[in-house]
Regions:
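Short, basic, helix/turn surface patches
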Residues: 72-83, 186-187, 382-390
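Cap/lid and interdomain-hinge subdomains that line or gate substrate/regulatory clefts
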Residues: 134, 138-139, 153, 160-161, ...
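TRNA-binding/sensing appendages of the translation machinery
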Residues: 1-84, 140
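Internal, well-ordered alpha-helical segments in soluble enzyme and binding-protein domains
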Residues: 142, 163-166, 180, 184, ...
Length: 390
């Protein structure tokens, strides 16, 4: 009993120290740290990659990229290189594979053109990628990690889950052109069933298939609430198999405290040439757009690495500092003011005695403008004298 009490007290102490440590970081940096710890806890290994790839690699897979432009330059040997606009492509191409699953996480930057300024900018991302045999359990694990990642950002979050076997597979049966498919997909993503019906009618899609598309586009709610509706609408083998997969996910996550944050929403769609199976997007209260995106991409993985399946997601960290500004009460625990170095040889050892105990310390000649410390000392004649708390 005494041993348990000691361990419990030590655990609480460590937790308090960690909270104080994270409080000194920006939202972006603290998330990097916490998410890395989460992924390691689940057995994922950190993957580090080169900043550059040959331009032709990204150019050949341009359809997969969400970025409008690729930032390129000539290498010293004359090769055309690119600052990476995407991380998934690089991991699939370069990761070492084995008979076991390759479970990786990363903290990297990509370089993409801004939609607003049309200038290139650095975007920081973290995320996970799994290469190997993807089964229903692994899909549930990755979705659980995605939900936990969102909770780390904000307890008020939603993870919207969809499946490529429904609307994309139905569109493939209709015998319509690619431009019409794109128009219908835009309507589905915007939940615009009025225009969807008009496009289908103009394109000669029968009323039965049109209504099925409209009903599928309207599927949105918690898994247990809408999965029976979706199962009733399944009209081919691919849809029925997808319903079984979604039922497994629902059963696996039902006891999770995050289960009520997962929504089934078929308006979430992605590139049909690369993605298959489960796809998902994550939202938090203060951010105006998705901060997490992922899915299963066997088509892309198989294109780059034969007989390889894959699933993963990325968390976009670049704008979170804007939406989640931390209000730090103090800039440091201790501020020490001293006049000159002469006769103050013991000052450095004194500062180290504080930092060794976990305190944050700043040493200055004068009070920095706008700086706040829990305790302010003046260092005089080899000793500290408390001045004031500011």
């Amino acid at each position: 009993m005494i041993k348990y009490a000691i361990l419990s007290a030590y655990s609480d102490y460590q937790e308090n120290i960690m909270e104080e440590f994270l409080a000194t970081m920006s939202k972006e940096d603290s998330l990097n740290y916490e998410l890395s710890r989460l992924y390691k806890q689940w057995g994922y290994k950190e993957y580090r990659m080169a900043k550059f790839e040959e331009y032709s690699f990204y150019s050949d897979n341009r359809d997969f990229l969400t970025a409008k432009g690729i930032l390129a330059f000539n290498n010293s040997d004359g090769r055309l290189m690119a600052l990476k606009p995407d991380i998934t492509l690089s991991i699939v191409k370069n990761a070492k594979l084995s008979s076991a699953l390759t479970k990786l996480y990363y903290n990297e930057s990509v370089f993409r053109m801004s939609d607003s300024s049309m200038d290139y900018k650095e975007i920081k991302q973290t995320g996970v990628e799994v290469l190997g045999k993807v089964d229903d359990y692994l899909v549930a694990e990755v979705l659980s990690l995605a939900a936990k990642s969102l909770k780390t950002i904000d307890k008020d979050f939603v993870l919207s889950v969809s499946h490529m076997a429904f609307i994309p597979s139905l569109l493939a049966e209709l015998g319509i052109g690619e431009n019409v498919k794109k128009d219908i997909i835009r309507c589905v993503q915007g939940k615009n069933t009025h225009d969807l019906r008009a496009i289908c009618e103009k394109s000669g899609v029968c009323s039965e298939k049109t209504e099925l598309l409209a009903k599928l586009a309207g599927i949105n709610g918690r898994f247990d609430e809408v999965l029976p509706q979706l199962t009733a609408l399944a009209c081919n083998g691919a849809m029925k198999k997808a319903c079984d997969e979604l039922a497994f996910i629902a059963a696996s996550l039902r006891k999770s405290p995050l289960a009520d944050r997962l929504y089934l929403d078929l308006s979430v769609l992605n590139n049909t040439e690369y993605y298959n199976g489960i796809i998902f997007q994550g939202y938090v209260e203060k951010a105006p757009s998705a901060v997490l995106s992922g899915g299963r991409y066997d088509k892309l993985a198989g294109k780059l690495r034969e007989n390889t399946q894959a699933i993963g997601f990325a968390v976009y960290l670049d704008n979170l500092n804007l939406y989640y500004k931390k209000k730090r009460e103090f800039d440091s625990d201790i501020l020490i003011l001293f006049g000159s170095s002469e006769g103050n040889e013991s000052l450095l050892a004194l500062v180290e005695s504080f930092t060794d105990k976990g305190f944050s310390v700043r040493v200055e000649h004068t009070m920095p403008e706008g700086y706040k410390a829990k305790t302010v000392y003046a260092f005089e004649n080899g000793a500290l004298r408390e001045v004031t708390a500011c």
